[in-house]
Amino acid sequence: MGQVWTAYDQRLDRRVAVKLLRPDKVAGQEADELRRRFVRECRVTAQVDHPGLVTVHDAGSEDEELFLVMQYVDGADLADHLAEHDPYPWQWAVSVAAQLCAVLSAVHAVPIIHRDLKPRNVMVKQDGTVTVLDLGVASVMDTDTTRLTHTGSPIGSPAYMAPEQAMGGAVGPYTDLYALGVLIHELLSGNVPFTGSTALGVLHRHLYEPPVPVRRLRPEVPESLEALVLRLLSKDPQHRPSSAQETYEQLLPLLPARGMPTGSPLDPTRPFLRPHAPWPDRARIPAPQPSAAP
């Protein structure tokens, strides 16, 4: 929703991210809906205080243009991170998923449903921590927020959309957990579980086709991780894990043990291997060697 620009805050001497929206570019009811969704994003994003979410600094309007000023996140989005590491280490996938569970647990406690969790909405920072972006399509569960746009289209991305969301039905934390299952499957296999030439075709597969177990594509993936992904991708929400907390607990035995060596940037295992360590982590960076005498 809208465009995001890197900007400079002259007052506080810092880089920020600015999301811009021009409702005048959309006519009639759609413009009103975009305004409402933008205001909701500002309020929703400001409600949740968690290190895995961007901080909102300011919001307002200027010359018919709505703006949201947010924390600038230095890193790579998860889609690019995946493209640069093929195959994606399963330990990295577990570490990303565990961090996402912590964020989702905080978001669901508000209670808010993200409804558009996907790699493009996740940033991996230089220190390996993960940040979730774009609560702009979030549904605040204790309000009468519509589940469909005024055009009748479900809000979200078809490749990551839970069956109940695709049908325009009630959504809940279980909806985000399905998207998390799609995301983990993509990290492990390199592709989302369901593809198609049209959005409708993709949604049909979410509704009626079983996903391919990831160990058929990557035998080195632990059986327990494959089983968790299949649970997350259950068509029936009642067959999925009951919460992000439960999902985290199932990932916990698969997380790397503390003290194992790490030092490279954008390594999502680092927060578990070296919790609270400074970044750059000088203890993990070899000291420069003196140059040889001429």
Residue positions per predicted region:
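Activation segment signature within eukaryotic-like protein kinase domains
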Residues: V96-A97
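AlphaC helix of the eukaryotic protein kinase fold
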Residues: R22-Q47
